């Protein structure tokens, strides 16, 4: 398992970043909150904590600035009906602190406003 990747940020888009480390360019999926934090850092050494998702047809890396963001991402994926891309969409719509507050207050309505997330799945996140 890969814990983090540190290297030169060579490319940045709202959905992914490329970090070159030891001559290898790693495409790392990111949330919009991470994108906002990375804007202006292209060409600089950057460190992202990562979670690696390995499936039959793909190996994906998802990057985070803090351990708390990564823990929240992993926790969201334990909910039935939530995959890595849906978890990333949730984390693009709200900050980690906002998501924790939404869950703590039981505000399934706020979660169901995220694209691709219906009311039943939003309720499962709350529970």
Which residue ranges define each predicted feature?
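Residue-level recognition of specific faces of alpha-helices
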Residues: 1, 72-78, 89-90, 102, ...
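Structure-specific DNA junction-binding interface
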Residues: 1-78, 84
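Amphipathic, charged-and-aliphatic alpha-helical interface segments
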Residues: 52, 59-64, 84-103, 124-127
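Glycine- and Gly-Pro-enriched alpha-helical subdomains that act as flexible
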Residues: 112-115, 125
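Charged, well-structured binding/catalytic surfaces in domain cores that contact anionic ligands
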Residues: 121
